[in-house]
A protein has these predicted regions:
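NTP-binding/hydrolysis catalytic cores, primarily Walker-type P-loop NTPases
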Residues: 320-357
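Walker A/P-loop phosphate-binding motif and the immediately C-terminal alpha-helix
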Residues: 90-94, 104-145, 151-153, 167, ...
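Beta-strand-loop-alpha "switch" segments that mediate conformational coupling across diverse proteins
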Residues: 284-329
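Inter-motif core of Ras-like GTPase G domains
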Residues: 216-221, 232-253
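Phosphate-binding/switch loop-helix module in NTP-utilizing enzymes
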Residues: 185, 190-232
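Phosphate-binding loop that captures ATP/GTP phosphates
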Residues: 132-189
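Conserved C-terminal guanine-recognition region of P-loop GTPase G domains, centered on the G4
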Residues: 259-275
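Extreme N-terminal, non-catalytic leader segments
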Residues: 2-109
């Protein structure tokens, strides 16, 4: 009201609220109620039963895994937790993408028209990341008719090949299939190609489809390491059944031209959906500057495909032998994790409209 003096800040601080005016009974009074056999006063007054959902939750920060943040957390006995760094949060996000669920099974074909650009190495790299981070089964199939070397990248645990798997009429369980595969330290399994060049060349589209029908029953992610020839019989089945392509290129001009020619051929032969969904991998074959400006290659392939990733040179990968993720340089491993996360972004897509099965 006009002329009425406003309360001072001290009065705001000490003024009783409506809830405070309903004074709670003194603890001594409650004690006397119990002593006299009287029922204690019920809370809350409105008779609503409290729920655990009403209790505010405080989520503890995750402990940092590296750097000065981890040192501070360790030295303080956990009393001081700076939280995870931006890099650790980014890695956590990549891992979550890689671990997202798959609709049934997911099939990835890795291919290149040019040999020696790291196709088999990339197949092993992606597969190893998936197998080590995910909890389900991941397998790579060697469909190279020209004496594929995929099985040389894992400890050899069996002499079986795709041909032996096809001839086995007693496959009823995962254990029956496992007898035909070798497994890397990452948990990635490999099904070897036929070692006889004549028999390998005769590996047909129908036989590839039969192999996939078996593997689909027991594996969540199936990678196929293709040969360099697009006209080989099995390639028709590979391209028809693949959900996504990983196209391998080197940073040299001839490698880039071969990758571009592969995209052209796929588009002309009814696989334009695979081109649009393809992930291009540019492998750097040696230390130092690449022969072609990487940014120009990125721009060219991004205009046609879903993503482009560059994998740095790594001496362990260059050995061409068994791949151990623990021996990779941290930058190489990070690049492979990012590549796997990009491929995994397509896991939730419904590919049934593209045919296959």
């Amino acid at each position: 009201m006009p002329g009425q003096q406003a309360p001072s800040p001290e009065q705001y601080q000490h003024a009783p609220t409506p809830q405070a005016q309903q004074q709670a009974p003194h603890p001594q009074a409650q004690y006397q109620q119990y002593q006299q056999g009287q029922p204690p006063q019920q809370y809350p007054p409105n008779g609503v039963t409290p729920s655990l959902e009403d209790v505010p939750m405080r989520r503890a920060k995750k402990a940092p895994g590296s750097g000065w943040r981890r040192a501070v957390h360790h030295m303080s006995g956990g009393a001081i937790n700076p939280g995870m760094s931006a890099e650790e949060l980014r890695l956590q996000e990549l891992v979550a993408r890689i671990r997202q669920p798959v609709r049934g099974d997911y099939r990835i074909a890795t291919l290149s028209l040019k040999g020696g650009v790291g196709k088999t190495t990339t197949t092993m790299g992606i597969g190893s990341i998936f197998a080590s981070i995910r909890g389900d089964r991941v397998i790579a199939v060697d469909a190279n008719p020209d004496f594929g070397t995929l099985s040389q990248r894992v400890p050899l645990q069996t002499r079986s090949t795709v041909r032996d798997l096809l001839l086995d009429q007693q496959i009823r369980s995962y254990g029956d299939v496992r007898r035909h595969t070798s497994q890397a330290t990452s948990r990635l399994e490999v099904l070897a190609s036929e070692r006889d060049p004549a028999a390998s060349e005769s590996f047909s589209e129908d036989e590839y489809r039969q192999v996939l029908r078996v593997l689909q029953r027991f594996y969540n992610i199936i990678l196929t390491d293709c040969g360099t020839g697009l006209m080989h019989s099995a390639m028709a089945g590979v391209l028809d059944l693949a959900h996504s392509l990983v196209l391998i290129s080197s940073s040299a001009i001839d490698g880039a031209r071969s990758a571009a020619a592969t995209l052209d051929w796929l588009s002309l032969h009814g696989h334009d959906h695979l081109v649009r969904n393809a992930v291009v991998v540019i492998n750097l074959p040696r230390e130092g500057s690449p022969n072609v400006a990487i940014q120009h290659l990125r721009e060219y392939f991004l205009a046609r495909c879903r993503a482009v990733h560059v994998i740095p040179y790594d001496p362990h990968l260059a050995e061409g032998a068994e791949i151990d993720l623990a021996r990779l340089h941290k930058n190489t491993k990070r690049a492979l994790v990012e590549l796997a996360a990009t491929v995994a972004d397509d896991f939730a897509t419904d590919h049934r409209r593209f045919g296959g099965y």
